[in-house]
Structure formats: C-alpha cells, structure tokens
C-alpha cells in the first residue's frame, strides 16, 4: 500500500509522462508535492521503485518509467509511455511556417522528417536553415500535426536527459503550456530549446543545467516555434 505522498508523486509522474513523454524534474516534483527539499523526493522515488510501481531508466539523467498504477487506478502492467524522451537545449532559426514540412512516408513503421540542422544546446544561436537532410522516425513517436527534427549541440539540457548529439523531434506549434520544453524564437533572430515557464507577465526560458542561467523576457520577445515530442540517440 502506498503512502499519500507516494501516490501523489506516482500520479504526477504518470500524468507528466503521458502529456509530454518526459519525466518531471526533481524540482518540479518537489513543488508539486509542496515539499521543502529534494531529499524527500529521492526517498519517495526509492519507495515506489522498491514496490515495483516505477523504474529508473539506465543511461538517462533522472529518467523514470511508470510500470503500474495502484489497484484503485486499475493496478496493471502499463504499456511504455509514448517514448519517454530525454530532451536538451536546441537552437533553430526559422519561423513556424518555414518548419511546417509535412512528413514523408518511409518504411511501414517509420516516417521521414526534415532534419533542419544542428542546434546549440547552450546560448541561443542563429538557426541553420539546412533543408537538404532528413531522418527516419518511428511512426509511433508522432501524433497529429507537422513535425521536424534538430540535432543537439551542447549540454544546457542534460538534466532533462538531452545530450550533445541527440536528435530531437519537434511538433510545430505557436503556443505551449508552462513547463513544456519548446523551440523558442527570441527577438526574431535566435532560436533555442528550453523549458518554457510563465512568471507573472514575463516568460522564462529555463535550461536544465545549473551552469546556465534562466532568461526572463517580455512575452513579445519570445515566439514558440514548436514543442519537444521525442528524442533519438545513437550509441
């Protein structure tokens, strides 16, 4: 039987994975459960893992997978969440209309997406508008809408599980909920992949690496170009 806090944390992780495909950060879990320190989150996660409700994914920073839910929520083995991805900071310099390239059908279980170039996962840089490359993506990774891919160059999102050299899959959109990892166009000149947060009347572009600072900007300086929906990694 789970404690109340274990249950609340399990439900929060499950809801976030199903909504974004990405595990919430320890800070997000701490805030969601109104705890004062992350050590409490570590203890709750260990308890959930020992009871077989979640498991940690190897070789990924803080990546978690929900295995089953409690009996009062149909306790049963769950299918893997929609590709639990580990996103990282990305830069792209293109407008949403330029990125809305329709996927091209590839093999029966994959889709070919335009690979628009290498994006710095650090300080925002001007996007590389390379339309000559493409990448095959598992069809199960994609939902509705238009998608494109970018290659990560940098380490500003490593605590979100996004590493240098990863390929991130982006769904084109012009808005996103707070806490979502997005491709954001800043001042119509530079594009970056960061976690979007709304702070009062301002917009914060938050890295997942303590070596980088969060940028807080007026909303008229930031345009959402897409949201992270998947990640591919080669070993």
From Swiss-Prot:
Protein keywords: Autocatalytic cleavage, DNA damage, DNA repair, DNA replication, DNA-binding, Hydrolase, Repressor, SOS response, Transcription, Transcription regulation
GO molecular-function term, one example from the UniProt record: DNA binding
BP terms from Gene Ontology: DNA repair; DNA replication; negative regulation of DNA-templated transcription; proteolysis; SOS response
Catalytic activity, as annotated: Hydrolysis of Ala-|-Gly bond in repressor LexA
Active site: 156 (for autocatalytic cleavage activity), 194 (for autocatalytic cleavage activity)
InterPro entries: LexA, LexA-like, LexA/Signal_pep-like_sf, LexA_DNA-bd_dom, LexA_repressor, Peptidase_S24_LexA, Peptidase_S24_S26A/B/C, WH-like_DNA-bd_sf
Short name of any one Pfam family annotated for the protein: Peptidase_S24
Superkingdom: Bacteria
Assigned EC number: 3.4.21.88
DNA-binding region extent: 26-46
Keyword hit for Transcription regulation: yes
Residues the UniProt record annotates as site (Cleavage): 121-122
Enzyme's top EC category: hydrolase
Record function comment: Represses a number of genes involved in the response to DNA damage (SOS response), including recA and lexA. In the presence of single-stranded DNA, RecA interacts with LexA causing an autocatalytic cleavage which disrupts the DNA-binding part of LexA, leading to derepression of the SOS regulon and eventually DNA repair.
HAMAP family (UniProt xref): LexA (MF_00015)
NCBIfam families registered for this protein in UniProt: lexA (TIGR00498)
Record-stated family: Belongs to the peptidase S24 family.
Quaternary structure, from the entry: Homodimer.
Protein name stated in the entry: LexA repressor
């Amino acid at each position: 039987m789970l404690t109340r806090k274990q249950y609340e944390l399990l439900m929060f992780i499950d809801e976030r994975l199903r909504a974004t495909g990405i595990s919430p950060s320890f800070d997000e879990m701490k805030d969601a459960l109104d705890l004062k320190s992350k050590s409490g989150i570590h203890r709750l996660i260990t308890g959930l893992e020992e009871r077989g409700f979640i498991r940690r994914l190897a070789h990924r920073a803080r990546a978690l997978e929900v295995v089953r839910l409690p009996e009062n929520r149909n306790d049963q083995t769950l299918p893997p969440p929609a590709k639990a991805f580990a996103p990282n900071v990305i830069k792209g310099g293109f407008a949403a209309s330029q990125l809305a390239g329709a996927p091209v059908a590839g093999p029966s279980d994959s889709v070919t997406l335009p690979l628009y170039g290498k994006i710095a996962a650090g300080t925002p840089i001007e996007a590389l508008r390379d339309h000559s490359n493409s990448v095959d993506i598992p069809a199960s990774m994609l939902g509705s809408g238009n998608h494109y891919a970018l290659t990560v160059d940098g380490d500003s999102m490593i605590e979100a599980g996004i590493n240098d050299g990863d390929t991130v899959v982006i769904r084109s959109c012009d808005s996103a909920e707070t806490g979502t990892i997005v491709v954001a166009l800043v001042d119509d000149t530079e594009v970056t992949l960061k976690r979007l947060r709304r702070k009062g009347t301002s917009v914060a572009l938050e890295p997942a690496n303590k070596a980088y600072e969060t940028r807080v900007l007026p909303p008229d300086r930031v345009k959402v170009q897409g949201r992270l929906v998947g990640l591919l990694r080669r070993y």
